[in-house]
């Protein structure tokens, strides 16, 4: 469960290292975000000499959460950390590589570009 003020790792090579969630998109007073949800975040740590800088406000899609994700067939997926992929206004990733396994639910939510870049789909 991701809520405002939650710190996230970045799972791509966009140039950001750490994010902090400041808003969850989708409803006016939505409290938590799960895998596949879009959040507004601020960059807390960035790689030098890249397009993204510290304290820049961006959009990101959640790809890993510590909270368990239960599927309809009974399988439970749980990751060790909270992570996101930086996206642009159209929903395409800003990075060209993704470093972690991605849940199958992202394909159903039309993040097909992120799924195609991922090394493994769980």
Curated annotation (Swiss-Prot):
InterPro entries cross-referenced by the UniProt entry: Ribosomal_uL14, Ribosomal_uL14_bac-type, Ribosomal_uL14_CS, Ribosomal_uL14_sf
Keywords, in A-Z order: Chloroplast, Plastid, Ribonucleoprotein, Ribosomal protein, RNA-binding, rRNA-binding
Gene3D superfamilies per UniProt: Ribosomal protein L14
PROSITE patterns assigned: RIBOSOMAL_L14
Recorded GO CC terms: chloroplast; cytosolic large ribosomal subunit
GO BP term (any one): translation
Claim: RNA-binding is one of the keywords in the record: yes
Keyword check for Cytoplasm: no
Location of the protein in the cell: Plastid, Chloroplast
Main location: plastid
Disulfide bonds: none
Role this protein plays: Binds to 23S rRNA.
Similarity section: Belongs to the universal ribosomal protein uL14 family.
Name listed for the protein in its UniProt record: Large ribosomal subunit protein uL14c
Species this protein is from: Phaseolus vulgaris
Organism phylogeny: Eukaryota, Viridiplantae, Streptophyta, Embryophyta, Tracheophyta
Recorded name of the encoding gene: rpl14
